[in-house]
């Protein structure tokens, strides 16, 4: 099928009205503009709707779509985003982080240079604490072809091939074949559930060292909260 946009920047959000503007401003600074910003609000209590209604009236080169749903967890929000996405590429970006100014330009370039696209489910950029600093291991060369399972492939006794937090970009049509399972009463499910299924079924990914996503850990972030949920 044809898509009206090259990229859907998808953001699931929950009680992030105090910080999501950082992401919005980074989208305004993008050097590439063939994208939409799709936000699924997973039952926030801090009323971000007012922010989005104001931003939708600003003169942006990209559309903003805001949808609110009953709180069901990040993966349910991603499922909703996949159903609504109008971009060929589906790039989930957390609401408390932001992108480098050339992030989407790089994503579009990676898509353009990818051979045999039918064998790939997408590609992966790097995350950093600044545009030039990352705690992640850098591999040799411009890119590395592999699968999501390379996050578990050991290259040294205490080192995996692809480590740390990464920025995953998927082909929307492929990701729609691998929606997240939904269980009654369960709100937390790791995204790796579908990434690994794609890998087991033969889909490759192309990994890049380039930093396109800036992050810092928050005390109330999903990674920390998820660890508590697993412990419980």
Model-derived regions, located:
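N-proximal low-complexity "stem/linker" segments adjacent to membrane-targeting elements
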Residues: 1-26
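Short, acidic, metal-binding catalytic loop of nucleotide-sugar glycosyltransferases
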Residues: 25-34
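A conserved acidic beta->alpha catalytic loop
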Residues: 26, 41-51, 94
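Glycine-rich, basic loop-to-helix element that forms the pyrophosphate-binding segment
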Residues: 69-85
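Short aromatic/hydrophobic "clamp" motif used to bind/position activated sugar donors
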Residues: 90
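Conserved donor NDP-sugar-binding/catalytic core segment of glycosyltransferases
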Residues: 102-139
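Conserved nucleotide-sugar donor-binding catalytic segment
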Residues: 129, 135-224
């Amino acid at each position: 099928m044809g898509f009206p946009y090259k990229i859907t920047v998808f953001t699931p959000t929950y009680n992030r009205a105090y910080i999501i503007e950082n992401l919005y401003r980074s989208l305004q600074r993008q050097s590439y503009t063939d994208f939409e910003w799709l936000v699924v609000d997973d039952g926030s209590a801090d009323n971000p709707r007012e922010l989005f209604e104001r931003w939708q009236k600003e003169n942006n080169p990209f559309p903003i779509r805001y949808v609110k749903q009953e709180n069901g967890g990040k993966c349910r929000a991603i499922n909703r985003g996949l159903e609504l996405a109008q971009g060929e590429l589906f790039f989930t970006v957390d609401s408390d982080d932001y992108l480098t100014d050339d992030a989407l330009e790089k994503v579009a370039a990676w898509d353009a240079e990818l051979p045999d696209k039918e064998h790939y489910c997408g590609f992966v950029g790097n995350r950093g604490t600044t545009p030039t600093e990352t705690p992640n291991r850098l591999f040799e060369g411009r890119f590395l072809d592999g699968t999501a399972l390379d996050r578990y492939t050991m290259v040294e006794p205490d080192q995996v091939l692809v480590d740390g937090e990464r920025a995953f970009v998927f082909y929307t049509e492929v990701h729609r074949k691998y929606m997240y399972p939904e269980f009654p009463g369960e709100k937390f499910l790791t995204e790796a559930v579908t990434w690994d299924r794609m890998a087991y079924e033969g889909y490759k990914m192309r990994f890049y060292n380039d930093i396109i996503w800036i992050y810092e850990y928050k005390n109330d972030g999903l990674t920390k909260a998820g660890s508590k949920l697993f412990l419980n």
